[in-house]
């Protein structure tokens, strides 16, 4: 009887759950995350547009953090990249030198702007 490698089995299951297409984005980019919410029979789409603070992890557990300010109140949300209930759309590319731009939390107004990356 052949012994099954646990990690190979885990990798096979995870591979099936990965999204086929994930847009290329990173810290500093402005993205729109469309969250599909199910309310009984109805499916509603809620948009969350903001700046990506970081992207971390690998495989099925890969996540990214988005920050937006609404009426002067900052909101940060973590999303799973391979979540089937979200769609990610890159609005504009930002030019930053860090993988995690935590310094954006202290900034407001004009100093919180990120330059656009020239393509």
UniProtKB/Swiss-Prot annotation:
Annotated coiled-coil segments of the chain: none
One Pfam match: Ribosomal_L19
Gene3D superfamilies attached to this UniProt entry: 2.30.30.790
Gene that encodes the chain: rplS
GO CC aspect terms: cytosolic large ribosomal subunit
Function: This protein is located at the 30S-50S ribosomal subunit interface and may play a role in the structure and function of the aminoacyl-tRNA binding site.
Keywords, in A-Z order: Ribonucleoprotein, Ribosomal protein
GO biological process: translation
Protein name (record): Large ribosomal subunit protein bL19
Top-level taxonomic group: Bacteria
Entry's family note: Belongs to the bacterial ribosomal protein bL19 family.
A GO molecular function held by the record: structural constituent of ribosome
């Amino acid at each position: 009887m052949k012994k099954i490698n646990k990690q190979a089995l885990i990798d096979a299951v995870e591979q099936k759950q990965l999204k086929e297409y994930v847009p290329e984005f990173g810290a500093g980019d402005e993205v729109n995350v469309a969250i599909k919410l199910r309310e009984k029979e109805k499916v509603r789409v809620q948009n969350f547009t903001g700046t990506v603070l970081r992207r971390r992890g690998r495989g099925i557990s890969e996540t990214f953090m988005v920050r937006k300010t609404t009426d002067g109140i900052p909101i940060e949300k973590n999303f799973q990249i391979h979540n089937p209930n979200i769609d990610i759309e890159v609005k504009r590319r930002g030019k930053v030198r860090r993988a995690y731009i935590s310094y954006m939390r202290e900034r407001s107004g004009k100093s919180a702007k990120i330059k656009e990356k020239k393509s």
